[in-house]
């Protein structure tokens, strides 16, 4: 879908893949930033790449959509949007479409390259068995409290992938249901206070670790 088509679909309330349009995306030698801020008077991109200077990367706004192409940022660097509201006050906002977030208590997004990981279910579909005639045993699990190291630190996505897979297989479970894994502020919660719908929580590693 081209830019114009996505813009028209967004305005009709029919853009089902907003994450491809908004947020931060690698574009040539720089990054394209785009955010929906209809009440803003002014918006700019700030981050580690420009010293958090609100004057360094101003965004152009049209019909509530603000965007800018910025040269120089590198994957992994932190960023936010500096937004001046109708009241004239400057507020720093996290990108709601960020694919990777700063580890709590920080709230910035991290620039993330699109992965070359070949998402698909072809292998599963080729090898799947007829399961509906047998029992279904679902293991619902919260990754942060399922198992930890002796010092109380979390296992990483990669460590959880190995240990949890072995555990559910040995226990005879046929399916796994993960409690929320998107970014959230409190370690004490189960993850339902989501602050980033497109970012797997950084508590357990990077987006690449999550894909592992």
What are these regions (language model features)?
Residues 1-32, 60-140, 145-152, 159:
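The feature marks proteins involved in alpha-glucan
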Residues 43-45, 79:
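Short beta-strand elements bearing conserved aromatic residues within extracellular beta-rich modules
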Residues 36-43:
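Short proline/glycine-enriched turn/loop motifs at strand-loop junctions of beta-rich domains
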Residues 126-128, 161-172:
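Short amphipathic alpha-helices and their capping/turn segments at secondary-structure boundaries
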Residues 46, 142-144, 179, 200:
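Conserved residues at the C-terminal ends of beta-strands
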Residues 155, 166-211:
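Aromatic-lined carbohydrate-binding/catalytic grooves of carbohydrate-active enzymes
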């Amino acid at each position: 879908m081209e830019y114009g088509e996505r813009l028209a679909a967004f305005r009709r309330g029919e853009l089902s893949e907003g994450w491809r349009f908004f947020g931060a995306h690698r574009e040539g030698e720089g990054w394209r930033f785009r955010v929906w801020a209809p009440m803003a008077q002014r918006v700019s991109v700030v981050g580690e790449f420009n010293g958090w200077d609100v004057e360094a990367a101003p965004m152009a706004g049209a019909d509530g959509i603000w965007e800018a192409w910025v040269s120089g940022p590198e994957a992994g660097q932190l960023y936010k949007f500096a937004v001046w509201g109708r009241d004239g006050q400057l507020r720093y906002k996290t990108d709601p479409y960020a694919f990777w977030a700063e580890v709590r208590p920080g709230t910035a997004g991290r620039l993330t390259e699109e992965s070359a990981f070949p998402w698909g279910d072809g292998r599963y579909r080729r090898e799947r068995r007829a399961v509906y005639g047998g029992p279904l045993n679902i293991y619902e699990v919260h990754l942060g409290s399922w198992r930890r190291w002796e010092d109380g630190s979390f296992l990483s996505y990669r460590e959880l992938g190995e240990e949890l897979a072995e555990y559910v297989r040995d226990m005879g479970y046929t399916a796994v249901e993960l409690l929320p894994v998107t970014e959230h502020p409190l370690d004490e919660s189960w993850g339902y206070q989501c602050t980033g719908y497109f970012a797997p929580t950084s508590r357990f590693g990077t987006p690449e670790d999550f894909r592992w």
